[in-house]
Amino acid sequence: MDNIDKTMKFDYEEIPKDNVETVLNNVHRTLEERGYNAVNQIVGYLLSGDPAYIPRQNDARNQIRHIDRDVIMEELVSNYLKENKK
């Protein structure tokens, strides 16, 4: 049986949710301290993968680069849906 006929499972190393939260809070705070629109900058980073959207101040750029963007997006969507469940 060819590998093309098999279903692939997406699996990634589990990153503690509190770590993602801590990093995003630090990035958000840092962006606001620098006078940027934090949401726009984070979205720019998530869509493009370009770390230039995140400042180096407070080690924010280094921290966010250590978390896969898919993991960050998953966490953001999950939290949004929990908070806005009707």
Curated annotation (Swiss-Prot):
One Pfam family, short name: IreB
Family label: Belongs to the UPF0297 family.
NCBIfam families: PRK05473.1
Protein known as: UPF0297 protein SH1302
Organism: Staphylococcus haemolyticus (strain JCSC1435)
